Amino acid sequence: MSKKTVKISIAGSAGRMGKMLVNVVDQHVECELVAATCHPSEEGVIGKDAGLISGINKNNIFISDNPKELLKGEVIIDFTTPESTVHNSNLAAENKIGLVIGTTGLSKEQENIIEKNSQLSPIIYSSNMSVGVNLLFSLIDKAVRSIDNNWDIEVLEMHHRHKVDAPSGTALSMGKVAAASREHQFEKIKKLSREGKVGQRSNEEIGFATLRGGSVVGDHTMILAHEDERIELTHKATNRKIYANGAVKAAIWCSNKQKGLFSMKQVLGL
């Protein structure tokens, strides 16, 4: 028996991640692209063939600025902006279709809307769709549970000069995993920046350092520092195709769910 072909809609199809997603879906045997949208301000791509815009052969899927076109799919993949993502999650919930969210920089209020909408439709929300990064999260959990509070935890991340949010969603997720492993409240112990005479760090504190420059796809390191030794857990992305591959894998998994809020950890069975 042949496998089901999942109908995929891509929001933000003219962006860097959107183009990569069009490429990955085109090559995948278990899904097909049925709709592609962009922001109304992207006038240069509206009505253009999504395949040609993405650097592949013509696929006869024409980019629209109407979000309702996304409803042609069984699952929407969304790497856009927080505002567009919330709108698309409302649309998915109203029509009970799946949604995979790779957008970062959502506020707590926006995340609450996503969570509420997951009561009506299946939503996969992850700060990073990469298999490797999600394995890193598992390694962080295991490592932090194995050490005591005398080890200091710091997170270092670097991305390309065009990234607009800082620290990255992945870096924050790393901190949240570590905090949960120590049974601490992340919001109370995070230190997103340091400047001037800030005093000695506390044992509970999780510090962040952010670098921006060049074309770096994404480097993330968690440093576990003790008096006499240091552990560094690192993931380096060299091609954003890893995020697209993960997102498509998540969309196929999502197509078999009725409702609920899930993460890549569940998709990958970690």
Please provide the spans of the model-predicted regions:
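C-terminal substrate-binding/catalytic lobe of Rossmann-fold NAD(P)-dependent oxidoreductases
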Residues: S9-A11, R16-P67, N149-L270
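Rossmann-like NAD(P)H-binding beta-loop-alpha module
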Residues: N134-N150, A166
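Extreme N-terminal starter segment of soluble prokaryotic enzymes
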Residues: K3-I8
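A short, aliphatic-rich alpha-helical micro-motif
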Residues: E69-L71
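Rossmann-fold NAD(P)-binding glycine/threonine-rich loop
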Residues: V86-E94, G102-I123, N134
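Short, ordered loop/turn segments at secondary-structure junctions
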Residues: H39, T104-L106, N128-M129, M158-H160
